[in-house]
Amino acid sequence: MATGSWPTIVDVATRTDPEGNIAEVAEMLSQCNDYEGDAPYIEANEKTGHEFSFRTSIPAGSWRSYNMGVGYSKSTTGKSRVGIGMLEDWSQVDRALLRHSGQGEKFRRSEDFAFLEGMSQTIAQTLIYGNTAITPAEFMGLAPFYNSLTAAQNGANIIDCGGTGSSNTSIWYIGWSPESFFLVYPRGTTAGIHMEDRGDTVPAFDNLGNPYLAFTSVFEQHVGLCPKDWRYGARMANLDVTNAGLAGPNAYDLFAGMAETVLHFPKTTKAVSGVEKTDAPNDQFGTRRIWYCNRTV
């Protein structure tokens, strides 16, 4: 996997917390889902979202002969905005249970890690399927941006794998960089998941509404996805997992489809004899290109 020069969640957390507390949490989070080590985190220009500009056309130039002028031309740009979602959860452990466990904070941290992993999986799922039209509080994921083969310009980056049944899935190919696809966090804050230890000052409640003393950890992450340049995202859609990669007249050639998908990106990083070198020294000028698929594929 390419390393690039832009900060990931662990890098940002390390720089913003001299004590290392957030960094430790971020390191744990990066072990839960690979995307945490793939995506650059950029500070948004708003508290609740990020407005960005993108190019809609470029000058083509003019062929000219002697004594012939050249017409004026210019590029054109557009603006768009993505929202930032707020994900939060509370871990509460009965104070008496913690004392009687014989492991104290070690027992509590093992419970906290389960919450970290759960939140990480929620963000990973939202990264693909998030749709504010269905759940307004979350952020918009990849699927709504690449949901039609013909309705939008970015439909050109959707490869139809031909599946028509109920066992279809998608494979995603994303080029991460600060100029293509990146994650954003609110202006004036720090990236990644934040953990607040509230001690035993916050009461917990049983099913009958009765309070009891509990040690409480509050976890929250504010994050959004910015598809600044849609050309660096591609989707292999309608992939029937029952015959992908199998031989036979009806089988889909998975590797041929992946090769076709790679060709949709406008440019790549340093290459030798047409083969990409993901560890190339100048990789910071390109994108960190990653495949995402489920375990079945």
Model-derived features with residue positions:
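Core alpha/beta structural scaffold of self-assembling particle/tube/pore-forming proteins
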Residues: 2-37, 49-53, 63, 73-297
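Short secondary-structure boundary/capping segments within folded domains
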Residues: 40-44
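Primarily extracytoplasmic ectodomains and periplasmic/lumenal surface modules that are beta-strand-rich
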Residues: 58-61
